């Protein structure tokens, strides 16, 4: 019974404190905006590769010089470099956000839950030794009589002496 209390206390201390939630939410939103900026650039680059290969190359070269770690700084630099392309990235990024964000919460929770189950299963298998059957060395397998041996095989083996 004491173990359950200890586990319960550990779980409650591992949860984020309510005052941390706004900061975590802001950081997550910022990271998602940066990622959607990156995805918008990828979509546009792929479109340009089909219609304007030189434009796709220029976007690729520009993107190699600027980090997507800060999507807003990337976008500001792109707007200074090529206003039309910057506006296009903003439009595509907004479109992606409008269409993906509805599904994101439940997809994220489902993927995290599934991944956690798989990690826990692998850990349990590793701790209990149930994950992998130990394989027998080849010499042991060849020294044992086969279950599929026929009576003729047994009589042939005894006459070989």
Swiss-Prot record:
Region (Disordered): 1-20, 130-161
Keywords: Bacterial microcompartment, Carbon dioxide fixation, Carboxysome, Chaperone, Cytoplasm, Photosynthesis
Alphabetical list of Gene3D superfamilies matching this protein: Chaperonin-like RbcX (1.10.1200.210)
Keyword Chaperone: yes
A cellular component annotation (GO) from this entry: cytoplasm
Main localization of the protein described in the UniProt heading: other
GO biological process, one term: photosynthesis
Keyword Cytoplasm: yes
Subcellular location: Carboxysome; Cytoplasm
GO-annotated molecular function: protein folding chaperone
Pfam families: RbcX (PF02341)
Bias (Polar residues) ranges: 147-161
HAMAP family according to UniProt: RbcX (MF_00855)
Quaternary assembly: Homodimer. Interacts with the exposed C-terminal peptide of endogenous RbcL ('Lys-460-Asp-470') via its central cleft, as well as C-terminal peptides from other cyanobacterial RbcL. Contacts a second RbcL monomer via its peripheral polar surface.
Function: An RbcL-specific chaperone. The central cleft of the RbcX homodimer (RbcX2) binds the C-terminus of an RbcL monomer, stabilizing the C-terminus and probably preventing its reassociation with chaperonin GroEL-ES. At the same time the peripheral region of RbcX2 binds a second RbcL monomer, bridging the RbcL homodimers in the correct orientation. The RbcX2(2)-bound RbcL dimers then assemble into the RbcL8 core (RbcL8-(RbcX2)8). RbcS binding triggers the release of RbcX2.
Family per record: Belongs to the RbcX family.
Record note on domains: The homodimer has 2 functional domains, a central cleft essential for production of soluble RbcL in which the RbcL peptide binds, and a polar surface which plays a role in correct RbcL subunit arrangement.
Name of protein: RuBisCO chaperone RbcX
Organism: Synechococcus sp. (strain ATCC 27144 / PCC 6301 / SAUG 1402/1)
């Amino acid at each position: 019974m004491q173990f359950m209390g200890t586990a319960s206390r550990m779980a409650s201390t591992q949860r984020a404190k309510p005052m941390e939630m706004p900061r975590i939410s802001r950081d997550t939103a910022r990271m998602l905006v940066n990622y959607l900026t990156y995805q918008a650039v990828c979509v546009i680059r792929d479109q340009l590769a089909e219609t304007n290969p030189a434009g796709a190359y220029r976007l690729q070269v520009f993107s190699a010089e600027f980090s997507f770690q800060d999507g807003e700084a990337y976008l500001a630099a792109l707007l200074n470099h090529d206003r039309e392309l910057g506006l296009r990235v903003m439009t595509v990024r907004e479109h992606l956000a409008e269409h993906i964000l509805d599904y994101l919460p439940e997809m994220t929770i489902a993927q995290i839950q599934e991944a956690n189950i798989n990690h826990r299963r692998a850990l349990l298998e590793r701790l209990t030794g149930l994950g992998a059957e130990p394989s027998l060395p080849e010499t042991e397998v060849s020294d044992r009589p086969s279950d599929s041996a026929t009576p003729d095989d047994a009589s042939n083996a005894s006459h070989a002496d």
